[in-house]
Amino acid sequence: RPFPLIRNKTLNIGALIAKKSNKKHAKELEFATVQVPSVLPRIVEIPSEKNGERTVILLEEIIERNIGKLFLSNDVVCAHPYRIMRNADLTIDEDEAEDLLVEIQKQLKKRQWGEVIRLEAEEKMDKRLLGILKEEFEIKDTDIYNIPGPLDLTMLMKVYGMEGFDEYKSPKYTPAPVPEFQNDKDIFQVIREGDVFLHHPYMSFDPVVDFVRQAAKDPGVLAIKQTLYRVSGHSPIIAALAQAAENGKQVSVLVELKARFDEENNIVWAKMLEKAGCHVIYGLVGLKTHSKITLVVRREETGIRRYVHLATGNYNDSTAKLYTDCGIFTCDERFGEDATAVFNMLSGYSEPKKWNRLIVAPIWMKTRFLQLIEREAEHAKQGKPAEITAKMNSLCDPAIIAALYYASSCGVQINLLVRGICCLRTGIPGISENIHVRSIVGEFLEH
């Protein structure tokens, strides 16, 4: 009997069973597996013997303790939960793909059955059962993670959602309104009066949604161009873009189909936007479009004016309440020219000869950062004030790290906020003693 196909990231109970027999000789063991149903709640509340106490049991424990009822003619020798993760990378030859959307849809179907790269097993799992799983999944010992507790802790979000524990939760944070956009002033007038900087989630994301909504309805708006990487489930941004197209605006939307684990959602949004009349593009071959930018072209009494929103965070009204990000509204013509150049480039037109304000990757962002670090090093050598403060998701580029080491050795004071991987070592005498690295772990995700 072939080994069953185990779906990616599903929780399963593996068991060794043997035919019931009165004979004393060694029984032949067989492997059996039961998938824990995802349609049932994983946390099951059971009656408590003590007043004021609430007792819960995990669904997999119930199955594990009663698994013998599924194999009545067998003895259950052991039963333990396990979970696998498969390689989720999509293998796409964009040069050969006639339709990127269709090709990604094909690859997504294969994702559930990719190569196994990780096995999570209960720490006390029977070694015979673990050996069978290791052999069948063709993994090494280093790919096996023995967990001293429940597997797949995403279920803790369900615990957080249980009623009756409000006193243990952090008070819900309410973002502050943005002063410039209060009093129901026309959003374009506010931006004309001066650039507006936003810091989410401390400041409300509402002006960003209102910007697209007003652009969709404003009779003076000729065109809206926007990049979308991740959006919320019932996105007001998507609805506004669709409405803009239906109102006769020229709407161009870059939907990044390769946004990791959001591919299926983005395919749905791309089809919906196309159906509404938007021009949907997927970006440059071989590159992922990670920038967040909106360009609104508006006809005014003084002529055509371009309004731009740039941000570090996604156009996602849900995560904007949980992720720390920055954004800016401007109608500075230099930013308008650069934003137009970005969309022309993403649409397949040539790269502009010069950029006014935007630093664009992979064209020259790394080069520019190296220049700025070198500038501070020169300032330090000349006895001038020299300091670098930078915030990033990760730091693992060898050239950037080497440049920071050099700047530190020259006397530059360097403060880094690194959310994730950091390959730079601090405190090395003569090399990195002037570098301080912090990773903030708080109520919000440092995005």
Where are these regions (language model features)?
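N-terminal localization/anchoring segments of enzymes in phospholipid and broader phosphate metabolism
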Residues: 1-388, 397, 406-410, 420-446
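Hydrophobic alpha/beta core scaffold segments
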Residues: 413-417
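Cofactor-pocket helix-loop regions in the catalytic cores of large enzyme subunits
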Residues: 393
